[in-house]
Amino acid sequence: MSKKALCIISGGMDSTLCAYLAKKEGYEIIALHFDYEQRTQEKEKECFKQICKALKVEKSYILDVSFIKDIGGNALTDKSIDIPKNELCISDVPPITYVPFRNGIFLSIAGSLAEKENCESIFIGVVEEDGSGYPDCTDEFIQKAQEFINEGTSKNFKVCIKTPLVRLNKAKIVELALKENVPLELTWSCYESEDEACGECDSCLLRLRGFEKAGFKDKIKYKS
């Protein structure tokens, strides 16, 4: 019986690279995508499907967690709140693009699905540099989430949450992704736009800076 990993894939660079690294480690990948009615949900879903096809994933889930939009309080799900432009967040206070406890919600659901599918690992593409003050993107948080899942599931089930990128910066992530032949042109990072990336939001700026520092050109289309 092959070992299985549940890979949370948003459609972005980091989670996609994590899935490729899981495959390299010999895991059978079960792919998981969350639809929480974020601004770019349709583009992210399209990217997820293309990435699954590229990885030859046989089993995938797209789960509706739109209640996150009902909770609100962030610019990703509330279009009345402007996405900050042309500034990277360097504060310890989470920016308005922070979705409260999003990774906690995702990992709780992933823990349930991992137990059902008998996965020994969960891969999630959290990156502390990208965290921009996000408290649920730290290594410490992930370790506590793993303890929580293992405490709340059956005694004969134990899962390891793997975060191979957590200490890397964006340039190193780009370099590693290209080394592993990850099709980054299939990924999407923009918080705001679905046709052409805005090039101005925090996520676009981090992505562009990563490509620039790595010495490569990003193949996706940008408005600016």
Curated annotation (Swiss-Prot):
SUPFAM superfamilies: Adenine nucleotide alpha hydrolases-like. Keywords: ATP-binding, Ligase, Metal-binding, Nucleotide-binding, Queuosine biosynthesis, Zinc. It catalyses: 7-carboxy-7-deazaguanine + NH4(+) + ATP = 7-cyano-7-deazaguanine + ADP + phosphate + H2O + H(+). Its cofactor is Zn(2+). GO terms for molecular function: ATP binding; ligase activity, forming carbon-nitrogen bonds; zinc ion binding. ATP binds at residues 9-19. Its EC number is 6.3.4.20. Disulfide bonds: none annotated. Binds 1 zinc ion per subunit. GO terms for biological process: queuosine biosynthetic process. Zn(2+) binds at residues 190, 198, 201, 204. Pathway: Purine metabolism; 7-cyano-7-deazaguanine biosynthesis. Belongs to the QueC family. PANTHER family: 7-CYANO-7-DEAZAGUANINE SYNTHASE (PTHR42914:SF1). HAMAP family: QueC (MF_01633). Catalyzes the ATP-dependent conversion of 7-carboxy-7-deazaguanine (CDG) to 7-cyano-7-deazaguanine (preQ(0)). This is 7-cyano-7-deazaguanine synthase. It comes from Campylobacter jejuni subsp. jejuni serotype O:23/36 (strain 81-176).
